[in-house]
Amino acid sequence: MSATIEIQNDIALIRMDDGKANAINFEMVAALNETLDKAEAGAKAIVLAGREGRFSGGFDLKAFASLGPEGVYKLLDAGAELLLRLYGGPLPVVAACTGHAIAMGVFILNACDTRVGASGDYKIGANEAVTGMNLPIFAMELSRDRLSPQHLTRAMIQGFIYDPAGAVEAGYLDMLSEPDKVEATALAVAGQLAQLPGKAYAWNKKSIRKGTLDRIKASLGAHHKL
């Protein structure tokens, strides 16, 4: 499985691990949606983690090369719908950024409520400007919401890649932990968030983010128009 789930003490720990870059393809999206179904049914908060040294390298470029334009648009929409689920879903979501997070990997971070990152020699950022790709609407909207305004141009238009400390300053991460403690730290944060009244958390989260959520929803199926 490319994503697994364990639920203990009302906290769902979801791990992405495809043995490689944790690339986002249809298989990974389906696996994550399945784990989120289980989390929403049986937990009060979620921790989303990668594997050691790697959170996610972004969309699966091999899949992009083989899918053709329409298939690529469908994968982009599937990724956008996953981000909508994380960003607008009812449960607190804490990211345990265990290593490199690139492109779609950082947009997943942006969709999580609190982001705990591993300190160390890791790369975090959106490289679309460097690789010559247009940013999807969901990437722009989430970045406007979560990144520091002072870093938005550098991060999203110029494709700057940050180290973990710089990622905190830019707004990709909220805090750092030692690499061997990042998952435990994220679980502790999730445990604290799970104590908050769940209905109010869900309502406030969705209401405050409604504008961003609506703009992303409106972009589904329209990537070819960018």
Where on the chain are the PLM-derived regions?
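Glycine-rich beta-to-alpha active-site loop
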Residues: 83-131
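Well-ordered beta-strand positions
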Residues: 114, 154, 158-160, 166, ...
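Hydrophobic/aromatic residues within transmembrane alpha-helices
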Residues: 48, 108-110, 167, 186
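Alpha-helical segments flanking ligand/cofactor-binding loops in enzyme cores
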Residues: 84, 106-107, 140, 153, ...
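Conserved CoA-thioester-binding segment of acyl-CoA-metabolizing enzymes
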Residues: 1-49, 84
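Glycine- (often His-adjacent) and acidic-residue-rich active-site loop
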Residues: 30-31, 42, 50-82
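C-terminal long alpha-helix characteristic of the crotonase
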Residues: 116-122, 168, 173-220
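Hydrophobic, secondary-structure "cap" segments at the distal end of domains
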Residues: 139-150
